[in-house]
Amino acid sequence: MAQDEQVLVVERKALEQAGMFQGLAFDVERYFSRIFVPGVPRYMSRPQAEADPAYKQLIPYVIMTCDGKVLSYVRGRRAGETRLVGLRSIGIGGHINPADDMPLFSADSREAYLAAVEREVAEEVSVEASHTNRVVALLNDDSTEVGSVHLGIVHLWALDSANVGKREQMITQMAFMSLPELREVRDTMETWSQLCLDGLAEMTR
């Protein structure tokens, strides 16, 4: 990672005020009303954020579905997060940087966040399909080193066609897979994807 990279974070105590959880939380508005208010989101150097569990880096985690199948891929050697290399994932997304021009101290921070997610996804994959975009859950996993300093915001994109191509070299073996196929390879997935796979029925209601 670049030593001067700035990433979007919130203090852990903002989550604690809304109710700390382990795994998935489906009451999105309860947490968004604490996170996306002026003065709460801020930028911090990524090396500092990676070492300080008092802060959570906000990570959009976009799950794409089409005709009952879910987009999946394996994180290759060029993955930015080396601790996840070689693991299967069903989430597209990454850190939000200041270049995303998100107004942190205005009432529009939530809308700006959603626009930043679209840009982040476009850096990793090309989506030549119309889609819906719903925030369906928040994801917290304090049981791992990676998870303790990140908070996932799980988006569900329902695509009207499977026309998705990769842009990032770290994305390998990309394909739409059925739920039975994904369950067969669950043990090869990163923890966040395992949690999302287990909660997919709730997310798609």
Task: Put a short name on every predicted segment.
Residues 1-171, 177-205:
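N-terminal leader/linker segments that precede catalytic domains of diphosphate-processing enzymes
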